[in-house]
Swiss-Prot record:
GO molecular function terms listed in the Swiss-Prot or TrEMBL record: proton-transporting ATP synthase activity, rotational mechanism
Annotated keywords: ATP synthesis, Cell inner membrane, Cell membrane, CF(0), Hydrogen ion transport, Ion transport, Membrane, Transmembrane, Transmembrane helix, Transport
Gene3D superfamilies in the record: ATP synthase, F0 complex, subunit A
Localization annotation: Cell inner membrane
Record protein name field: ATP synthase subunit a
Pfam family, one: ATP-synt_A
Family statement drawn from the similarity comment of this UniProt entry: Belongs to the ATPase A chain family.
Bilayer topology: Multi-pass membrane protein
Primary location: membrane
Amino acid sequence: MVHPLLFLQFFRKLLEPLHISEAGADAIAYTWLIIVFLLIVSLIATKALKAVPTGMQNFMEVVVGGIENMVEETMGEKGRPYFPLIATLALFVLVSNLIGLIPGFFPPTANLNTTAACAIIVFLSTHVVGIKKHGFHYLQHFMGPIWWLAPLMFFIEIIGHLSRPLSLSLRLFGNMNGHELVLMIFFALAPFLVPLPMMLMGVLVSFIQAFVFMLLAMIYIQGSLEEAH
């Protein structure tokens, strides 16, 4: 849902030659804004590293350390190489969700193109990791444990794997877009009484959706690392 007042209106004009819709242009604009924001925060946090962290370094160490602990608890030590990917996706989704709570800003995750792009990254990473780890034996993940059921299981597994990016993208898009719609309705009905509780609910929804997306990404990659039986 597009806010009545947008912060980066000029992007619509900039992207007009590409015939991109207004909602798509807004999503692109705010996606780049979030990328720049995360880069600036990372540069500030790592500019002058200290043995005893303070300020932004301390905050980012807590955030990144929390994500790292979750990766280790879910995937074990073999999940460490995939921590940068999972942490980047988690932070991007979280900030994308939260930015919609600022008046005049649009959450890119309320646009299906953005959520689909993130889901495709997870989908491709899962199978690239699986092929890199197991080689051609990775195909055994799709065959099932009983050889004479392999053709049927292969078909079922293919459908299951193709449904993963669909469910990942639609879940995040549906929740964030639905929240935007509900927020707009309540703002129209009671602009002075409802905003605060709705904003608090928005923060909760933003964190939950980022957590669910990160958790599913870890589970999918973890599954591709396991030996097929």
